[in-house]
A protein has these predicted regions:
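Surface "functional belts" at beta-alpha junctions
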Residues: 1-80, 108, 113-114
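Acyltransferase
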Residues: 75-122
């Protein structure tokens, strides 16, 4: 799905009404930074009032019934692939953005919180 002046919002299902997401323009520039967002009827409404946003990913499924804005477009069946990272990788390469693999640390959106399972099976 490609149109001028449309924003793109990939979503990964977190838990409850939370998603890991960001919003990008056609050139893949950050409009809203990567983060963990709790979804309600006002999520991204400031952007939706002015532009259409295409929502995709397994997190968008649960948002479809909550975000009812006329500019919200939900696309199903998009499966993320490594080839989808090509444009971002090429841009980083052209800009000389390389990671020092000896000191690189993964980017975690949230701290891990261990919980004890409620049903203990022996």
């Amino acid at each position: 799905y490609f149109e001028e002046d449309v924003l793109y919002c990939p979503m990964i299902d977190a838990r409850r009404m939370e998603v890991y997401s960001a919003v990008y323009d056609n050139a893949l520039n950050d409009v809203v930074p990567v983060g963990a967002y709790v979804i309600d009827e006002h999520t991204f409404s400031d952007l939706l009032d002015n532009r259409r946003i295409v929502f995709a990913g397994n997190g968008s499924t649960k948002c479809k019934d909550v975000i009812k804005h006329r500019n919200a477009i939900f696309v199903e069946g998009i499966v993320p692939l490594a080839t989808d990272m090509l444009a971002l990788g090429e841009r980083a390469f052209r800009n000389g953005q390389f990671e020092d693999v000896a000191y690189f640390e993964p980017f975690y959106l949230k701290e891990f919180i261990a919980t004890t399972p409620k049903n203990k099976i022996l």
